[in-house]
Amino acid sequence: MELLRNLFEGYPNLWGGGVAHSVLILSLVIAFGIMLGKIKVAGISLGVTWILFVGIVFGHFNLNLNEHLLHFLKEFGLILFVYSIGLQVGPGFFSAFKKGGFTLNMLAMIVVFAGVIITLALHFITGIPITTMVGILSGAVTNTPGLGAAQQANSDLTGIDAPEIALGYAVAYPLGVVGCIMSLLGLKYLFRINTKQEEAEAEQGLGHLQELTVRPVSLEVRNEALHGKRIKDIRPLVNRNFVVSRIRHLNGKKESELVNSDTELHLGDEILVIATPIDIEAITAFFGKPIEVEWEQLNKELISRRILITKPELNGKTLAQLKIRNNFGASVTRVNRSGVDLVASPQLQLQMGDRVTIVGSELAVSHAEKVLGNSMKRLNHPNLIPIFLGIALGCILGSIPFMFPGIPQPVKLGLAGGPLIVSILISRFGPQYKLITYTTMSANLMIREIGISLFLACVGLGAGDGFVETIIHEGGYVWIAYGMIITIVPLLLAGFIGRYAFKLNYYTLIGVLAGSTTNPPALAYSNDLTSCDAPAVGYATVYPLTMFLRVLTAQLLILSLG
């Protein structure tokens, strides 16, 4: 009994002092939290956030860690978490602002800044400290990096931790998840959505998915001006990004053929074109008319295969440099990066981990496969240099002070913002400088989950001491209502703007709204409503900017009003 008492209370004996005690407490908090996160009520789970609540319970009963160790593990966990997020979202961060992505990100910004305005209004009306209100804001929008950024900013400003930030987050978080899902469901009935029609339009890329996905379309050549022209001569005339994957000539042949830049078109030829939905209408009008063709049945010798880019020397090279068509007689028709299909244009730079779709004969595709790699074993080997180099650079960037007018203290990006920005930049521009930034999804997820688990456990342990007293005696239960207001009002406002001003497809809209609250349970709910990828594409398009703004605004609120 004495041994167990010493172990749990952390007395400096028997098990090597406080180390065994700290590891035990931290491990139990994380393990119990993850187990509780498996529980679903009405199909909704709080996931790893249960770690925070278990930590609060442990902290309430004084099962805690050394103060300095607690602070270190919390910050280190936060760094791992935000850095892994940056690696994931970085490749698509800047491209998300192009064309339709710009509109979706504008809508997400409305959600973010509406929440900030409501938070400020409640702060001035009720007199609740801004530290508490920022915690409520982060919980209401289920944004853990925002919580970390707020705590970091407050620590830089005052030199001490503010447990009320974590308390506000913990109180608002559960209904932040539920409130977001209920808002998405409410919009469905308010807009009287015809689900079949919306899903059909989403499948065609209508409703601001036109620039964010690619689709195949079969066309018959009817434009007399194209008769006898080569593909490479036609591309500048169309002024659209597209790939002609296959062709069947009107010369009695029943089989389809691959296309290269010197292939000539003739009236009546049937072609398979890969392009973004917004370009398909113009491309169709230019070539002729859409038709239905079963391409797989026309030539059994042609196969289509997805191949992974796993050779480091290909990192940053363009498709034109690889000369797949000239060397092997196969065609690259599309490139999948981070779950999004891209048009395989000659200028597209490849990255480690890209999945390219190649069409050709079995022999040609096999030769191309050897050149590209397609070795999961090679991808599974972690590239640790960019991770730790990026974390080091992120810590340096996060420590640089920036002066803003009206803010008495210099603003620092901190240990949340610095590593996030560096990881986005490295993952986006690293391949151009031959820096391998790819990590497998499982490895990235492992880093992220370890980071968020450490962070939430430490936040809960630190906030547990005064949690019950705050809720019962200091009016903490009212924070729940404030959190619901911050959750629901911006979503409904943005929902109406997105539907009636931006004419968004419903499934795209709910994906954007889920992404603007960085809410994975809401995305899971949205995906369950439809078989199309519109919610996931909408979520992924706005997630990077939203995450960045949540971190930045949380810091600015603390530094300007703290």
From Swiss-Prot:
The chain crosses the membrane at residues 15-34, 41-63, 78-97, 104-126, 165-187, 384-403, 413-430, 450-472, 476-498, 505-524, 539-561. Keywords: Cell membrane, Membrane, Repeat, Transmembrane, Transmembrane helix, Transport. GO terms for biological process: potassium ion transport. It is a multi-pass membrane protein. GO terms for cellular component: plasma membrane. Pfam families: Asp-Al_Ex, TrkA_C. The keyword Zinc does not apply. Residues 204-286, 289-374 form the RCK C-terminal domain. One of its GO terms (molecular function) is monoatomic cation transmembrane transporter activity. Its main location: membrane. It is found in: Cell membrane. This is Uncharacterized transporter BF2507. It comes from Bacteroides fragilis (strain YCH46).
